[in-house]
Amino acid sequence: MILFTGCSLTWGDELEDREGSRFSGKHPNIAECGMSNDLMVMKTIKYIQEHPEIEYVCAQFSVPRRLCYYKDGWKNMTPWTKNVESRVWYKYIDTQENRMMNLWRNVYILEQFLKDIPHYFWRASEDSEKTVETDNIYRKMTKWSDMVTLKDLLGTPDTHPFHYGKGHPNE
């Protein structure tokens, strides 16, 4: 059985008929809208531990700006989350280097967990990633260091003004 995991892109948020337009085979899709890479990796590992019949994993990593924190349970946060934790994190601590280290650490962790399960990784991306000045040790350790991004899948050149829309792609 194939397991799908990721954020709203994998969940099917951009589809008018999410259930009707989905992959035709029987499959679990544990993706959630707004899910951070931290929670996606945790949820994926837990799901596979509880469902050892999974034969293949298709994992979509989210934009690196999403993180999680623990306060009465695990919660996702973004620069637009309206709470004290998010405001403090994104104002005083957040950097592109932290974001990218967290992304590639999550890729590496999931890759290691899935070493005996065939898998495919792809990811959403954001232009601000290009401002990172240092390469990342976790990126160097994973075979997915050059994984396909949503921008690659859309098929327009990087220089095209509509290369990446301002929200979810349309059907």
Feature map (PLM): residue ranges:
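Serine-esterase "nucleophile elbow" of acetyl-processing enzymes
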Residues: 1-43, 49-50, 170
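Alpha-helical cap/lid subdomain in secreted, periplasmic
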Residues: 45-171
